Regions:
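A structural signal for multi-pass alpha-helical bundles of membrane permease subunits
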Residues: 2-240
Length: 240
């Protein structure tokens, strides 16, 4: 395939991703009246189609002023999100990376059963485990604390499933050579597995961050004190 065709395909894909981001950015500079006018056919069931201009007709900084200056609780909720999400992502890597390495590089009894259990737990939606998680966290005295969000998130099985593929792709010749040079299992993991598995680790970090930064059900269920709420629960209320 010629280079110009590849460039056109990549440009089209980039445009497909860029357009929604640009729409969000332009909407942030629109006043409420202009936004309602653009979406009137959808909001009021009028005849016609909603339209979205490339640039706001009457740009304004009012939404930013209202959010950043007139709503000081925004910064509290932002800090709450950081306190919850960053420990979760760090815990997922600290716990998940060694587990993924073990699944990818070692043979042990019960490996298939344990891996199947990981897959089953990964496929279970939060609604299935919500009641049991509630009772466990309540018995541990963690309800209405940030740990009620951090601990279940840090032991998520999805990062393990994701990183296994990247660790398994590392050539066995490299680990065998390191073993012959006298490196132990832990040294091989630290000095060989982690550097070569960076793409998988970064993928797990990005997906884990997005998942828990936008989480709604977990904080809504486990956090009754609104001062502990993250941005994902606070922002939907700002337009009221």
């Amino acid at each position: 395939m010629k280079k110009w065709m590849i460039a056109m395909l990549l440009s089209a894909a980039a445009l497909f991703v860029w357009v929604p981001l640009w729409m969000l950015l332009s909407a942030s500079f629109m006043g409420s009246r202009e936004m309602v006018h653009n979406l009137a056919p959808v909001l009021s069931e009028e005849v016609g189609y909603a339209h979205w201009p490339i640039l706001p007709q009457y740009p304004t900084l009012k939404p930013y002023v209202e959010l950043l200056l007139d709503a000081p609780e925004f910064f509290t909720m932002f800090w709450n999100s950081c306190k919850q999400v960053f420990p979760i992502v760090a815990g997922q890597i600290v716990i998940g990376a060694p587990a993924a390495w073990a699944f990818a590089r070692f043979r042990f009894r019960g490996k298939g059963v344990l891996y199947a259990l990981y897959i089953i737990l990964m496929l279970m939606p939060f609604q299935v485990t919500m009641v049991s998680s509630y009772f466990v966290l309540d018995r541990l005295g963690l309800m209405n604390t940030v740990w009620a969000i951090i601990l279940p998130g840090a032991v998520s099985t999805f990062p393990v499933f994701l990183m296994i593929r990247f660790f398994a792709a590392i050539p066995s010749a490299l680990t065998e050579a390191a073993s012959l040079d006298g490196a132990g299992a832990w040294q091989i993991f630290i000095h060989l597995g982690l550097p070569l598995g960076v793409p998988g680790i970064l993928s797990a970090v990005v997906l884990g961050f997005l998942e828990y930064w936008n989480a709604l059900e977990q904080p809504m269920t486990f956090l009754k004190d609104q001062t502990l709420w993250p941005l994902s629960l606070y922002l939907p209320r700002t337009g009221k």
